[in-house]
Every structure is written in structure tokens, then in C-alpha cells.
Amino acid sequence: SPIKECADNPANKMVEHRLHFSYCFGVQAVILEVDEETGKVQILRVYAANDVGKAVNPSLVEGQIEGGVAMGIGYALSEKFEMKDGYVLTKEMKDMGLPHTTDVPLDIRTIIVEETHPFGPFGAKGVGELPLNATALAILNAIYQATGVRVKHLPITPDKLKAMLAERK
């Protein structure tokens, strides 16, 4: 299949049905604390390693990774966008549960991996929202490591986590 062909050849050659000129790879790890009485999750540190090809402007790449981490934290812990029967129920930004600056740790350790790409501009691959999904999944795995509770639905709000912790006992 075209998708399998692209996945099997992520960087070394162009293929006819390529979905994108390059694929980016990243991995995140999260250190957190869980208050089992309230279900509140406090993110203490995030490690974010991302292969961006050539980092043309490393400071901007670092900022992009930090922004993706913040988005991933919101995605995992608080953000919601509700619809019913094709109608938007979450009508205002204030109701979406976007993370506040206090929800994002000061300790985000970005690791820029530079594996240049022959077809990217100046060897770049891109970074975009690459850290978003990896951060959310790293948070869920860290919650599992801390509590033994496997979260399968997002966002994992304090009330939802508190209920899952109570079921565990």
C-alpha cells in the first residue's frame, strides 16, 4: 500500500504516493506527581527529543517544541471541544480547558535531533505539532507508572482520574 511504502522509506527516497516529503520522529518522557485524593496531576518535567532534520533556527525550533509540549499537556489533562448532533456545544475559548501558564512546567528539556533530509529546505524536516501527541501519551504512561491506572480516554480531568483511582482499590 502507498502508506506502508512511505512508512518503510521514511527518509531515504521519494516515492510516488508520498504523503509528505519527510517524516519527523520524536519521543517524550514526563515526570509528574499525582495527588490521589484530588486526582490532580502536576507535571514537573518534560523531556522532548525531536528529529527535525536541520534546525535552521535552533531557538525557534526549541520554542516550537515547548509550544507543542504545552498543547500536549492541555490535550491530555484539560482540553475539551464538545459537539452534539453536528452542533458545537463548547462555544467559547474559556470553556475549552486550555492550559494556563501554571499548568506548563518551567523544566522542559528539549533535545533537538538533526538528521538532515535530502528533500527538505536546507535539510529541514519540520517540527510543527510533532511534540503534541507524544507529550499526551507520555503523560498517560507516567500516570500509569505512578498509580497503576491505565487511562484510555482524554482528557483525564482530576474528577475522572479520582474516580478511576477509587475503582482501582
Question: Model-found features: residue ranges?
Answer:
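C-terminal catalytic domains of large/alpha subunits in multi-subunit enzymes
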Residues: 1-169
